[in-house]
């Protein structure tokens, strides 16, 4: 007998053993087929969230499956240094002590960051272990460790030497609070209610006439270089080429024609400010205007405008109106609007809904800023230095396109190819510099004249310059730069290693759609460019894990579920503290608290890692977002318990008994049709689950396994086995015990990729009993292979007859309202010999006996069922009055519930305004109540006949 199922106990025991025994490491036998998988490195600042648990369940499931298929598997884990996120965390810690990074200086500050990383950096990898990830921890990397730093430098230098990295002035997303450029992924578009200001721009040769320009950003007016109109807009064609007076400045700017302008938007006249708007930048570039920068890096108005051409060359600047100099952009907006009003330039202000770009870390409004940055050229052709391959001579962007167009990289689901191509066809040069201290410092040095020397180290730079006293570039690289190299930086590049031969390309990348461009495309570019190979063969895109209402999980919204809390459980008070700390709007705390109490009135009970993993696997349908339902996790906790209890039953009936293994393996085994049926179902399940794993359909694998184990094995076969063990001869009992063990052991191996802990624990006991312990761990045992010869059609046909008979008897009991504890005799009238079936009925349907008769006995009360040509009748005395009273009371109760639910659904506006999932639940509840009522009414009618 097994002890009670205790997930925590078996999880810690087995994971430690797996890791200590080195089971996660590839054996580097290059004659074996390889399977490798790329882990999206989580931020070193981070803790495990539901998205991690979701994609790591899929990745680990694949790794365990292919390991059991005999592959040389490598799942290399690592963490990302997460430049901005990490620097912010440490700066906030220092701020709490009234210290800034500038007080410490760069070197001391970086020491603090490394100290923090050593203390906190292991949290997420320990949590990955809790989920059961069988990653090779001996190969764990950090994107700023020495090996990765060396690779980053080598890649940067080579790209620079190939003419693919340059420094120039470009428009970037600028976070004035952080004081750095940020990527598009770090910018959130927030819908806000703002204003649209309509401003008069008088004609220079006739100030009485003017065009009206509509803008949401009057504070950038000082940097205007033109007003654009649509060339097809007849209202303004006569003005194209004329000069306008720019309000508040006295400067004149031209009217230009550009198809970017929508005739029906605003007034049809758009101010063009190339240094402070991305769309205007493109318009300005087409018309070769100037770029006039009017803000400093803190987003305050400059005293003197900085002017450049589109080559980034400085031109003669000019003074800006003195009254605005030094004002923050929003203070400047207020002052300028007041001045426009006073001077008669402001026509009207209209309310306007707009999308405001905000930094996801600081919440500050992102400013398009013209700054000097380092870029990777996306469309330029390299000037040599590439490995021979089909990608040689192509630009980085063309390499990435070719990899997907040729089928070398496959997207699953395939529709993501369109998204990928859309991004690639509109690609811009990649801004890779960041004005931070934490990150890979750019390997470039400057002399006093501003000449730049890119080199692997300072000594090499000084050799290039022919002098000493060079100054190192202070900027660091975008975090995505080092992340883009992990497919080969983790396998020993630039050396030609066995790891590169065996594991590049990896088989699959499992990731969310939001980083297809930022990470996936860049890995394809860098890997094809430096190795001549694609980084991975398949890209499996999964959806986002949302809360039960379909909202994105966010700590700032208070709707996050911590996967570790699902594994270990957490009390209500601790859960409330967790969910109401760090809210974006602290005033929503009472609402969050109320919702939490409603959802988890007693906190979250312990589910165990296996139940969490099975839940995630069940959600893993291709590409769809997931609304996480806690009830489903509870259901899969019950499933694990069911497996445990089923194993207990099997052990009770097989331990120290003749099971047809070992010494009695040669003894005859008289298999019954249920034995042959369950073995046939096992082989069908092996086929289906193998197909599901190999096509990334973990949802189908989970569904198939659940149905087989719960319905076929536990609900049907175990119950039929009880009959065989009680009534069968020695040969029949031996066959049943043999089948019980054989099918259970194979099912445990089928389940192992999804639920590794419980399967390891049970397999260690079950496998030796059926001569199946071929390895020290289930994770090293071979995955089951289907044998179609064991699918016996006659056994399936016989099982269908038996299931129909049992279903008919159960329906009869239900129709007659016979309580579960009441036993009754069954009479079966049939010309066929049903002896093989009837022996199972008493135990399966709580009968005193099941008897085949030539004709059913006479009875006025007993209903008759027909099943496969046989007539069935239960003989039982019924107290009609008592049963009528009971059913009438039940009907009354059901009617009240129906009335209440119908009233709710017919309430005006409810079905349109209530959350869709609640409306669907109410409709499902209504259908269920109506079905119950119909059955009760049917029984009452029969009693009255």
UniProtKB/Swiss-Prot annotation:
Gene Ontology molecular-function annotations: aminoacyl-tRNA deacylase activity; ATP binding; valine-tRNA ligase activity
Tagged with keyword Hydrolase: no
The keyword Cytoplasm appears for this protein: yes
HAMAP family linked to this entry: Val_tRNA_synth_type1
Keyword tags: Aminoacyl-tRNA synthetase, ATP-binding, Coiled coil, Cytoplasm, Ligase, Nucleotide-binding, Protein biosynthesis
Enzyme's top EC category: ligase
Ranges in a coiled coil: 879-945
Complex and partners: Monomer.
Taxonomic superkingdom: Bacteria
NCBIfam families associated with the record: PRK05729.1, valS
SUPFAM superfamilies (alphabetical): Anticodon-binding domain of a subclass of class I aminoacyl-tRNA synthetases (SSF47323), Nucleotidylyl transferase (SSF52374), tRNA-binding arm (SSF46589), ValRS/IleRS/LeuRS editing domain (SSF50677)
Gene Ontology cellular component list: cytosol
Chain ranges passing through the membrane: none
One GO biological process term: valyl-tRNA aminoacylation
Enzyme nomenclature, EC number: 6.1.1.9
PANTHER family: VALINE--TRNA LIGASE, CHLOROPLASTIC_MITOCHONDRIAL 2, VALYL-TRNA SYNTHETASES
Gene for this chain: valS
Domain statement: ValRS has two distinct active sites: one for aminoacylation and one for editing. The misactivated threonine is translocated from the active site to the editing site. The C-terminal coiled-coil domain is crucial for aminoacylation activity.
Protein name: Valine--tRNA ligase
Pfam families, per the entry: Anticodon_1 (PF08264), tRNA-synt_1 (PF00133), Val_tRNA-synt_C (PF10458)
Similarity section: Belongs to the class-I aminoacyl-tRNA synthetase family. ValS type 1 subfamily.
Catalytic reactions of this protein: tRNA(Val) + L-valine + ATP = L-valyl-tRNA(Val) + AMP + diphosphate
């Amino acid at each position: 007998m097994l002890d009670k199922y205790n997930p925590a106990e078996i999880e810690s025991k087995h994971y430690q053993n797996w890791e200590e025994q080195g089971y996660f490491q590839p054996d580097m036998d290059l004659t074996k087929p390889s399977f490798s998988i790329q882990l999206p490195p989580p931020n070193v600042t981070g803790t495990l969230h539901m998205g991690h648990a979701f994609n790591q369940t899929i990745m680990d499931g694949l790794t365990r499956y292919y390991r059991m298929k005999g592959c040389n598997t490598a799942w290399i884990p690592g963490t990302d240094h997460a430049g901005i996120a990490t620097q912010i965390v440490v700066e906030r810690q220092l701020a709490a002590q009234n210290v800034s990074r500038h007080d410490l200086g760069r070197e001391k500050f970086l020491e603090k960051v490394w100290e923090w990383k050593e203390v906190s950096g292991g949290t997420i990898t320990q949590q990955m272990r809790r989920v059961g990830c069988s990653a090779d921890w001996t190969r764990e990397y950090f994107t700023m460790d020495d090996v990765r730093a060396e690779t980053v430098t080598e890649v940067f230098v080579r790209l620079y030497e190939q003419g693919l990295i340059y420094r120039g002035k470009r428009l970037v997303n600028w976070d004035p609070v952080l004081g750095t450029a940020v990527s598009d992924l770090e910018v959130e578009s927030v819908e806000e209610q703002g204003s649209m200001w309509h401003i008069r721009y008088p004609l220079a040769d006739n100030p009485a006439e003017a065009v009206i320009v509509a803008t949401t950003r009057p504070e950038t007016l000082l940097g205007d270089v033109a007003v654009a109109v649509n060339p097809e807009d007849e209202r303004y064609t006569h003005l194209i080429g004329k000069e306008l007076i720019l309000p508040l400045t006295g400067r004149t700017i031209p009217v230009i024609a550009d198809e970017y302008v929508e005739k029906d938007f605003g007034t049809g006249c758009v101010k063009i400010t190339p240094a402070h708007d991305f769309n205007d930048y493109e318009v300005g570039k087409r018309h070769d205007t100037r770029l006039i920068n009017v803000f400093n890096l803190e987003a305050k108005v400059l005293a003197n405008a900085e002017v450049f051409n589109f080559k980034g060359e400085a031109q003669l600047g000019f003074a800006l109106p003195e009254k605005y100099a030094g004002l923050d952009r929003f203070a400047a907006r207020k002052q300028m609007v007041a001045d426009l009003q006073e001077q008669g330039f402001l026509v009207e202000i209209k309310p306007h809904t707009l999308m405001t770009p905000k930094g996801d870390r600081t919440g500050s409004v992102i400013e398009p800023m013209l700054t000097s940055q380092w870029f990777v050229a996306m469309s330029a052709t390299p000037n040599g230095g590439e490995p021979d391959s089909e990608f040689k001579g192509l630009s980085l962007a063309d390499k990435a396109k070719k990899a997907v167009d040729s089928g070398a990289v496959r997207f699953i689901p395939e529709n993501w190819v369109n998204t990928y191509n859309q991004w690639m066809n509109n690609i811009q040069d990649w801004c890779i510099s960041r004005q931070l201290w934490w990150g890979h410092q750019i390997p470039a040095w400057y002399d006093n004249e501003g000449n730049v020397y890119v080199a692997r180290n300072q000594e090499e730079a000084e050799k290039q310059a022919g002098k000493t006293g060079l100054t190192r570039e202070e900027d660091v690289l975008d975090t995505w730069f080092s992340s883009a190299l992990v497919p080969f930086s983790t396998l020993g590049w630039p050396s030609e290693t066995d790891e590169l031969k065996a594991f590049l390309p990896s088989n699959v990348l499992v990731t969310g759609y939001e980083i297809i461009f930022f990470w996936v495309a860049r890995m394809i570019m860098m890997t094809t460019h430096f190795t001549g190979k694609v980084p991975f063969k398949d890209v499996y895109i999964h959806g986002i894990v949302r809360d039960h209402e379909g909202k994105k999980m966010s700590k700032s919204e208070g709707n996050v579920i911590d996967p570790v809390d699902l594994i270990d459980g957490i009390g209500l008070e601790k859960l409330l503290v967790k969910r109401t700390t760090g809210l974006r709007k602290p005033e929503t705390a009472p609402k969050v608290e109320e919702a939490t109490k409603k959802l988890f009135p007693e906190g979250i009970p312990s589910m165990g890692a296996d139940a969490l993993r099975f839940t995630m696997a069940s959600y893993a349908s291709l590409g769809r977002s997931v609304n996480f339902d806690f009830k489903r996790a509870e259901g899969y906790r019950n499933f694990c318990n069911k497996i445990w209890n089923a194993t207990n039953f099997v052990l009770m009936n097989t331990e120290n008994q003749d099971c047809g293994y070992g010494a009695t393996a040669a003894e005859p085994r008289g298999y019954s049709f249920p034995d042959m049926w369950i073995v046939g179902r096992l082989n069908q399940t092996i086929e289906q689950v193998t197909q599901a794993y190999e096509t990334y359909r973990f949802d189908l694998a989970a569904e198939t396994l659940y149905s087989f184990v719960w319905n076929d094995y536990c609900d049907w076969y175990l119950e039929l086995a009880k009959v065989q063990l009680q009534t069968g001869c020695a040969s029949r009992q031996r066959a049943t015990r043999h089948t019980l063990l054989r099918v259970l052991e194979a099912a445990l191996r089928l389940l192992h990729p999804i639920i590794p802990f419980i399967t390891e624990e049970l397999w260690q006991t079950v496998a030796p009993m059926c001569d199946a312990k071929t390895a020290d761990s289930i994770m090293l045992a071979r995955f089951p292979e289907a044998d179609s010869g064991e699918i016996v059609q006659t056994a399936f046909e016989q099982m269908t007859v038996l299931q129909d008979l049992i279903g008919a008897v159960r329906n009869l009991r239900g129709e007659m309202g016979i309580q579960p504890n009441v036993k009754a005799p069954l009479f079966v009238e049939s010309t066929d010999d049903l002896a093989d079936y009837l022996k199972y009925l008493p135990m399966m349907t709580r009968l005193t006996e099941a008897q085949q008769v030539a004709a059913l006995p006479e009875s006025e009360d007993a209903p008759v069922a027909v099943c496969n040509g046989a007539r069935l009748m239960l003989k039982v005395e019924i107290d009609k009055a008592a049963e009528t009273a009971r059913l009438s009371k039940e009907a009354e109760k059901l009617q009240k519930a129906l009335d209440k639910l119908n009233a709710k659904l017919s309430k005006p506006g409810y079905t349109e305004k209530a959350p869709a999932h609640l409306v669907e639940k109410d409709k499902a509840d209504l259908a269920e109540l109506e079905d119950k009522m119909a059955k009760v009414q049917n029984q009452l009618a029969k009693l009255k006949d």
